[in-house]
Amino acid sequence: MAALAALRLLHPILAVRSGVGAALQVRGVHSSMAADSPSSTQPAVSQARAVVPKPAALPSSRGEYVVAKLDDLINWARRSSLWPMTFGLACCAVEMMHMAAPRYDMDRFGVVFRASPRQSDVMIVAGTLTNKMAPALRKVYDQMPEPRYVVSMGSCANGGGYYHYSYSVVRGCDRIVPVDIYVPGCPPTAEALLYGILQLQKKIKREKRLRIWYRR
């Protein structure tokens, strides 16, 4: 009887201890989960406090902002008044003349052909470049003022074209002068050359000459 009475007295005590143990175990599990995966408020705070790197394209000072706007103004004026130097070497020159005709009217884009390299800022190499003509091409290119651009028109100017394996043909005018725009075709149409001129205007728009000079 005494043993039964003792068991009856121990039963509520054991129940309380088991409940406390279960509560402690659940609390430990929650604390470990919180340690493994932080709460949703912590990333927001850390992201808010994190320092976001500033892109290099954005101006970081007033002086750089003024230089950037001046750069945009100069690029706008430069791309709106391209003066190409005619360097017709083969049948591609006929399509280049076609682009200057009233049907396509390249003057509406500010493109005006000049006869002197000292008044030009664009050279359109139209046709097959031979080994004898290569020194003349380089000499004319060196006489053009900076900044200067080169448009390679046609397969022969791009890589030799039909005469790629000829002993007397340069396999691409980019071996003589740096080329900015390649216009494919044999010969390319006037629309293709006009599209190449528009791509050159987009390239000039993205230039950052003054900003690069200012950041030195």
From Swiss-Prot:
Residue numbers binding [4Fe-4S] cluster: 91-92, 156, 186
Cofactor binding annotation: Binds 1 [4Fe-4S] cluster.
GO BP terms, alphabetized: aerobic respiration; electron transport coupled proton transport; mitochondrial electron transport, NADH to ubiquinone; mitochondrial respiratory chain complex I assembly
Keyword Metal-binding: yes
Residues found modified as Hydroxyarginine: 114
E.C. number(s) listed in UniProt: 7.1.1.2
Domain of life: Eukaryota
Gene3D superfamilies documented for this protein: 3.40.50.12280
Keyword Hydrolase assigned: no
Modification note: Hydroxylated ar Arg-114 by NDUFAF5 early in the pathway of assembly of complex I, before the formation of the juncture between peripheral and membrane arms.
Reaction(s) this enzyme catalyzes, per UniProt: a ubiquinone + NADH + 5 H(+)(in) = a ubiquinol + NAD(+) + 4 H(+)(out)
GO terms for cellular component: mitochondrial inner membrane; respiratory chain complex I
Any matching Pfam family: Oxidored_q6
Disulfide bonds: none
Keywords attached to this entry: 4Fe-4S, Electron transport, Hydroxylation, Iron, Iron-sulfur, Membrane, Metal-binding, Mitochondrion, Mitochondrion inner membrane, NAD, Oxidoreductase, Respiratory chain, Transit peptide, Translocase, Transport, Ubiquinone
Cofactor: [4Fe-4S] cluster
GO terms assigned for molecular function: 4 iron, 4 sulfur cluster binding; metal ion binding; NADH dehydrogenase (ubiquinone) activity; quinone binding
Topological relation to the membrane, as annotated: Peripheral membrane protein
Transit peptide extent on chain: 1-37
Localisation per UniProt entry: Mitochondrion inner membrane
Subunit structure: Core subunit of respiratory chain NADH dehydrogenase (Complex I) which is composed of 45 different subunits. This is a component of the iron-sulfur (IP) fragment of the enzyme.
Similarity section: Belongs to the complex I 20 kDa subunit family.
Protein name according to UniProt: NADH dehydrogenase [ubiquinone] iron-sulfur protein 7, mitochondrial
Organism name: Bos taurus
Underlying gene: NDUFS7
